C-alpha cells in the first residue's frame, strides 16, 4: 500500500509540473513545428539565421557583430557550444571572457533575435579536437561517438550542464528567453553509416537523452541522413539544400549550414564564394519549401590561441558576410540583406500554403505561394548556368540572368534577382594600412635540449605526442644520443650519414649537436611526414634533438581516442659501417614545450626571467619582443607577419594564434570566378603563390593606451624588421 501511495504522489507531482510548464509556455510563448515551418507562439515562421561563434571574437566585439546581423534582417543567431573551452580539465568549468556563453546569448536577446544552440557536444567547426577536451581521450575504456558507456556518461554530464545553465538563466523561449532550438550531436549520419549497429544505438540514445533534459524547445540532428529518431528534426548541411526532404514528412525543411565560403588551410589558397551564388542557393531553398536557413558562417572570426583544427589557419574568415574583423564584406553583405528583405515580404504567403510549380521553359520554373487572405508570392527561377532567358509569367515578361531567381512578393513586380548585385555606391573595398612599423625588437634564443638536460625524462621507446603533452603545448622534444666510432667510413670520406624520421605529424625540426639540420612538415590531406636527409655527425657522442610540433588536432571523424601525433618511428641512421642502425628502440628522453613557454616569456612577468639581446634574425627557435602604444581610432587592427616563418604571437600575454606565414599557397586560382554553375570549395580560389595568411587579428580590447607587449615566437627563422601593425578599413 505504501508503494501505491508513493506512486499516486509521484503522478500528482508530474501532473503539477506539466501544468506549470504549460502555464509558463502560455505566458512566454512556445516553440514547436509542423511540416511547413517552425512555429513560434503558434505562428509559422520563415527564419533566416547566421552562425557566430562566441570564442572566435571578443566580448567587446559581440554587440556590434550581433547588431549588424540584425540589420541584415536575420532572425536567429546560431552557435556551437565548445566543450574544450568550457571544461579544459574534468569537472573544472570556465564560462568567462570569450567563453561567457550566457552573456553572449543575453546580448542576442537584447537585440531581439532568437538563438539556435548547437550543444553537440561534438562541434567539428574546424576547431581543435572537434571541440572535445583532450582529457576525454584518457577516460578508461572510452570510444568516441559510438555506443560506449564512458563516452555517453561524459557527454550526458556536459550536455546536462549546459541545458541546466540555460534554464537557470531563463534563456529558453518558454522562459522568456531567446533559445528556440537545440542541437544534439553533429553531422553523425555518415559516421553511423560507417560503423553500423553501434552508431544506430548511439544515435537513438543521444536523441532520447536530449529529450529527457526537458529543454522545452525542439532538438535537431543535422546531416543525419536516413536514420532519424522520431523526437528530433533532421536537417541539411551543404552548399545547396533545395532537394533535401526530412525523412518524416511531418517535420519542416531546415538548412543548418549554408556554407558562405570555406575555411583556409595552411599551404592552400583562400576560398571564396560569389554573393550571387549564395543568394541563389537561399532563394532556391525557400522556393522549394524551406523554412529555416542558416549561413555558416555569417561572421567567422579568429582562431585565437591554439583553437584551430588540424592545419586550419588562424583566420576563420570563411568569406562570410561579416569578415574576420566584424566589418561588412561587400557586396555580399548588402546583397544578402536585400535578399532577406524580399523573403520577409513573401513570408505571409510562404507560410500559408505549399508551392504551385509550373514550367516556364526547359530550365526555368515558377514557384507560387498564396494565402486565403489574398497574399501571393512568386519565385521565377532560371537554372541554366550559361544563358539568360526571357520568360512569361502571369501575362508579363521577365528577364532572368543565368543561374538566378527573381522574387515577386506580390506575384507581379520583381523586387530582387539573385544575380543582379547592386553594390553600395561608391564601391567599398577592404584594405590594410600600416599604422606602426620600424619597431624596436629584442630577442631571446631558446634552448635546444639534449638527452640529459634538466627537466627531461627517459624511456626505451617512442611516445605518442599528445599522451605526453595533453595538448598543453604544441611542442614535444624527442632526444637521444648516437655514439660513432672514429673509423666510420663516411668520416674518412668527408661524407655524412642519412637520418630518417617517420612522424604522425605535423611539423619536425631536426637538430644534431645543437645545430639545425632541416625541417619537414605535412598537410591537411597528409599530416604524416618523413624527414630523410644527410646530417652532420662526428666521432664520439652525437646528440639528436627532434622538436615535434602539432598544428591543431583533428576535428572530424569518430575514433578520436585513436588519433596519434608526433614521432612514432621508425627512426634510422644509415650510411654507417654496420649499414643501417635502428634508433627506434633505444633510450629516448622527452621534454614538453619550449624553455620560453616554461618561463612564460610572452607575458610581462615571465619576460623578465630571461636575458634579451639584439634581434637574431633568420634563426630557429627565437623569441622576439617589442612594445608599442595603441594607435588612435577604432579601426580593427592586425599584425603583418609576412616576413616571419612559423610560430605563435602574443599581445600583452594573450595569444592571437599560430602564425605560419612562410607556408605559401599552392594551387590554381581564379580571382574573377564565374558565379554561375555549381559551387564547390575548390571552384573559386585566391592568393596563389602568396602566404596562406600574413595578417593576424589584434583585438582592440586587448590593448592598453601605452606600452603594449608584443611577443613573437619563431620556430623556423624570420625577420622582424618588416613586421608592422596595420589597420583594416573599408573604403
Swiss-Prot record:
Q: Which residues form the signal peptide?
A: 1-29
Q: Which GO terms describe its molecular function?
A: beta-galactosidase activity
Q: Which UniProt keywords apply?
A: Glycosidase, Hydrolase, Signal
Q: Which conditions up-regulate this protein?
A: By ethylene.
Keyword check for Signal, yes or no.
yes
Which is a GO BP term held by this UniProt record? carbohydrate metabolic process
Q: Write down the SUPFAM superfamilies for this protein, in alphabetical order.
A: (Trans)glycosidases (SSF51445), Galactose-binding domain-like (SSF49785)
For the keyword Hydrolase, the answer is: yes
What is any Pfam family matched here?
Glyco_hydro_35
| Class of the enzyme per the UniProt entry, highest EC level | hydrolase
- Active-site residues, Swiss-Prot/TrEMBL: 187, 257
Q: Can you state which reaction this protein catalyses?
A: Hydrolysis of terminal non-reducing beta-D-galactose residues in beta-D-galactosides
Family matches, as InterPro entries: BetaGal_gal-bd, Galactose-bd-like_sf, GHD, Gly_Hdrlase_35_cat, Glyco_hydro_35_CS, Glycoside_Hdrlase_35, Glycoside_hydrolase_SF
Q: What is its EC number?
A: 3.2.1.23
| Tissues with expression | Senescing flower petals.
> What family is this protein classified in?
Belongs to the glycosyl hydrolase 35 family.
Q: Which PANTHER family match?
A: BETA-GALACTOSIDASE RELATED (PTHR23421)
> Which protein are we looking at?
Putative beta-galactosidase
The coding gene here is CARSR12
